[in-house]
């Protein structure tokens, strides 16, 4: 999957109220592609829209790690 396709998927999921699992998978893919800005946006969306889920806990952990890495 290309970065453009992943971005399109992420936008589609966000527009459709994508589930936490799908958003997390997309954020992790973006992070692997070194698109950390977009990954952080997706992680923040997960934390805000899906609080209390395991995916939100993972997203919060990744945000802390990315913030610490600068």
Protein language model regions, located:
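Alpha-helical linker/edge segments of TPR/alpha-solenoid repeat scaffolds
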Residues: 64-70
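Conserved small-residue packing positions in alpha-helical repeats and bundles
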Residues: 27, 61-64
């Amino acid at each position: 999957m290309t970065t453009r396709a992943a971005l399109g998927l992420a936008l589609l999921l966000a527009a459709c109220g994508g589930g936490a699992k799908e958003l997390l998978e997309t954020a992790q893919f973006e992070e692997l592609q070194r698109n950390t800005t977009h990954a952080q946006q997706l992680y923040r969306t997960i934390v805000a829209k899906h609080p209390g889920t395991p995916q939100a806990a993972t997203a919060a952990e990744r945000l802390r790690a990315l913030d610490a890495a600068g």
